[in-house]
Amino acid sequence: MAGASTSRKSYGRIFTLLRDHNKWFENSIPLIASENIPSPAVREALISDFGNRYAEGWPGERVYAGCTYIDMVETECMKLAKKLFKAEFADVRPVSGVVANLAIYSAFSDPGDVMIAPSIPAGGHISHGRKEHSGTAGLVHGLEVEFYPFDAKSMTIDVDATKAKIIDLEKAGRTPKIAMFGGSLFLFPHPVKELAEFMKGRGMHINYDGAHVAGLIAGGQFQDPIREGADTMTMSTHKTLFGPQGGLVLGRNEHAEGIKKAMFPGLTSSHHIHHMAAKAVAFTEALEFGKKYAKDVVRNAKALAESLSGLGFKVLGEDGGFTKSHQVAVNVLEYSDGGKIEARLEKANIIVNRQLIPGDIKAGRHYLHPGGIRLGVSEVTRLGMGTGEMAEIAELMKQAVTERGDPKRLASKVKSFRKPFQKVQYCFDKKLPAYEYVKLR
């Protein structure tokens, strides 16, 4: 009986914590660049019975029975993805952006091959990383990873230095098999067009990791990697592309079979069918509302960056206008380190993440206490905020970072600021409040 009592208490506590989390975000300013808020329709798809089913393989070629409606939804999902990104081929099965990248590694390289990618302090993602850093490319697939030369002033890849490095690698018999563009700190477009011909002339497969900027690409507000020369494009589906957590691979028909085999049976069994259905819903929303949303996101990011700079913050990328994406990067070393600033802001219910920035590793700073913070405006934009609100957010951040006033009082200000912004915009159905806890028991 004691065990039953304990389990019952845990049962109740879990749901209490879930409700508390929703209430917290209802009263916070969410600025995590890798997050967004799904529409009520996407949430509805996520709780469908699809989440209880298996559908191994490709539509029409399943290992299991009972997939009639799953196949129809997945076929529609692929059709929508291809339309959204103007792609010949789409595989909607990756359960994350990391799995999407693994599909590329598996399909187009072998362990021991070389890949060139952005380093983490230069904005690269851990899935692009070396084995010694526990990066997916090195640790899981056995790739030897070289890093692009990076221009810290312009916050993008140095084209001429990259060409020189690849020539040196070629002379050493280490021509990269894969060139990876994209990253997790991604302020400006990467030079795909400028490097594509040079890379393809050396037999390199070009992949563009659009995890962060997929929604901006779909909305015509960033760059167009496939038209610029990328062979394939990977992404997650829950950042600027406002769907459920998941991944997606795009490419040309000539790449389809390799990707399909990598995904199944290589990397997935069930591919979380309810998330696939929710992706399909999100793609319809992106096709209908994505252009305006992407434009508003970029406008808001620039407004937030300019407001922070005007308040004395050292915002990275000033020479290029601070940002052309949803992100803003700030060097906070004059106040403290990124970890401590993240904690100060969280006390005020302003949610950001610490960020390694160029120069950190050479200075001996690591991920727990880096020199910067990263901000993203995807979620606050979807809640209906505009450039005026970005100026208010900058002022609230200044108060929190400089510790002017009581954190509890500042959290109360944040709560008042958030009160008018409680519905998801850029979607077909706005009935359910964005963070309302839906009780099914």
Curated annotation (Swiss-Prot):
The keyword Cytoplasm is annotated on this UniProt entry: yes
Organism: Cenarchaeum symbiosum (strain A)
Residues noted as binding (6S)-5,6,7,8-tetrahydrofolate in the record, renumbered to the chain: G124, H125, I126
Protein EC: 2.1.2.-
Any GO BP: tetrahydrofolate interconversion
Family, similarity comment: Belongs to the SHMT family.
Cleaved signal peptide residues: none
Role summary: Catalyzes the reversible interconversion of serine and glycine with a modified folate serving as the one-carbon carrier. Also exhibits a pteridine-independent aldolase activity toward beta-hydroxyamino acids, producing glycine and aldehydes, via a retro-aldol mechanism.
Protein name: Serine hydroxymethyltransferase
GO molecular function: glycine hydroxymethyltransferase activity; pyridoxal phosphate binding
A Pfam family per the record: SHMT
Modification N6-(pyridoxal phosphate)lysine, positions: K239
GO terms for cellular component: cytoplasm
Localisation: Cytoplasm
Cofactor(s) in the UniProt record: pyridoxal 5'-phosphate
Plays an important role in substrate specificity (site feature) positions: H238
SUPFAM superfamilies reported in the protein's UniProt record: PLP-dependent transferases
CDD domains, A to Z: SHMT (cd00378)
Keyword Transferase: yes
Subunit-level organization: Homodimer.
Pathway(s) annotated for this protein in UniProt: Amino-acid biosynthesis; glycine biosynthesis; glycine from L-serine: step 1/1
Keywords recorded for this protein, A-Z: Amino-acid biosynthesis, Cytoplasm, One-carbon metabolism, Pyridoxal phosphate, Transferase
